Amino acid sequence: MMSTRSRELSTPLRKFKCVVLGNVSVGKTSLITRFMYDTFDENYKTTIGIDFLSKTMYLESDTIRLMVWDTAGQERYRCLVPSYLRDSAAAIVAYDITRTETFQEASNWIDIVRKERGDDVIIMLVGNKTDRQDERQVSWEDGEQMSKESSSMFIEVSAKSGYNVNLLFKRLAQAMPGLQSTRLNRSISNLGWSNTDLDEMTEINLENAYELEFEKQCNCPC
């Protein structure tokens, strides 16, 4: 069996940008942190501006680097979102299953993505916080219906418990355009996955740069 190192040397590394969108406090940062580090912190601070992390993923026939952009959900930053979508291959639109308003806003986030990228982007609609079933306000069926209407993929997860988080990113990676794994392995069960490569992660805090860009380009009221 080919080692991870051998595969990395023999397979060209393709990079795909994924932007994570959604209202404030739907758990965007928690989703990313669970995927990257397999940890959860109840006391995360709200993202200001944008953060960037990347992770190398090994599929059966491909090696890719997924570059994940964690965006702020505050209204004052929305005018900058299109600029971060322009070269993206995928967008995760997250909502909180315990807050109906975040689900309603998810359709607006999807519209922003489609307006900027059309059909040249993979959209994954993600209902977060399934660990709080007793507080659920948005049904699984509602999420599935929105995904069908918007031609998006759909999954429910819990960043807190880790439920379905790896599966979310597996499905996203599988759907990336131009990969042998995409063409040959349409079922999730045939997708090879290595969760051992945590040394390929990079974290950059772009808060200051984002704030300067905001002040320079955005005319939104603050």
Language model segments and positions:
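Conserved beta-strand segments of the P-loop GTPase G domain that flank and frequently precede/overlap
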Residues: 68-69, 92-96, 125-128, 156
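Conserved Switch II/interswitch segment of TRAFAC-class P-loop GTPases
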Residues: 88-107, 117-120, 131-137
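Short acidic active-site motifs
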Residues: 76, 80, 102, 142, ...
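Switch I (G2) and immediately adjacent beta-strands of P-loop GTPase domains
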Residues: 44-79, 86
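Conserved phosphate-binding and hydrolysis motifs of nucleotide-dependent enzymes
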Residues: 22, 27-28, 72-74
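Short, conserved catalytic or interaction motifs in soluble domains
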Residues: 23, 42, 97-99, 181
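Conserved P-loop small GTPase signature centered on TRAFAC-class small GTPases
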Residues: 1-25, 63, 120-222
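A conserved segment at the C-terminal end of the G1
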Residues: 29-41
